[in-house]
């Protein structure tokens, strides 16, 4: 197993250990119960409900094409190639929230990822991952798990089952 994959697994394991024991504080007035209640728009413009991945582990990663961490795409693709048949889904969420490091359109992101990293794991359209305009999934995670769950930079990871 490559060093990058081991590092991703170590990070995810630490995150699960930390966030797994935190109480849910999401408002009872909402009908959202799990991550599977959310939907993204795919990089191709199609509806992409997280419910499609029920029963699988989903590693949700906010990405950026022009970041110093962009090389993590290689490790994420390795994870997808190695574990997708065993129930792991890698979901890339391109975001321009940190330093303007994402390309201007979903088509450009898809082309960049295909040409440079041969990415074939599912990806969403460009989305906000922090602040008042954040995608509802990211708002829910922040509310449920507090400030440490809010991405502070690109390639922040959330593992959901």
Which residues fall in each region the model found?
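Conserved helix-turn-beta segment immediately C-terminal to the redox Cys motif
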Residues: 56-57, 66, 71-94, 114-117
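N-terminal secretory signal peptides that target proteins for export/translocation
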Residues: 1-4
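Bacterial N-terminal signal peptides
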Residues: 8-21
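N-terminal "domain-start" segment that seeds a small globular fold
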Residues: 24-51, 71, 136
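Thiol/selenol-based redox catalytic cores and closely related redox-interacting motifs
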Residues: 113-114, 118-161
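Thiol-based oxidoreductase modules, predominantly thioredoxin-like and allied folds used
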Residues: 87-105, 119-131
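Amphipathic alpha-helical repeat scaffolds
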Residues: 62-66, 154
């Amino acid at each position: 197993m490559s060093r990058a994959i081991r590092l991703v697994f170590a990070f995810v394991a630490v995150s699960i250990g930390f966030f797994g024991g935190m109480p849910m504080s999401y408002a009872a007035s909402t009908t959202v119960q799990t991550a599977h209640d959310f939907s993204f728009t795919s990089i191709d413009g199609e509806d992409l409900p997280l419910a499609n991945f029920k029963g699988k582990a989903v590693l949700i990663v906010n990405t950026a094409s022009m970041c110093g961490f962009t090389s993590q795409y290689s490790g994420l693709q390795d994870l997808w190639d190695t574990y997708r048949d065993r129930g792991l889904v890698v979901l890339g969420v391109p975001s321009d929230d940190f330093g303007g490091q994402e390309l201007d359109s979903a088509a450009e992101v898809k082309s960049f990822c295909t040409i440079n990293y041969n990415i074939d794991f599912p990806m969403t359209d460009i989305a906000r991952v922090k602040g008042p305009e954040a995608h509802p999934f990211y708002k829910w995670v922040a509310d449920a798990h507090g400030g440490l769950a809010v991405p502070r930079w690109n390639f922040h990871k959330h593992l959901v089952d």
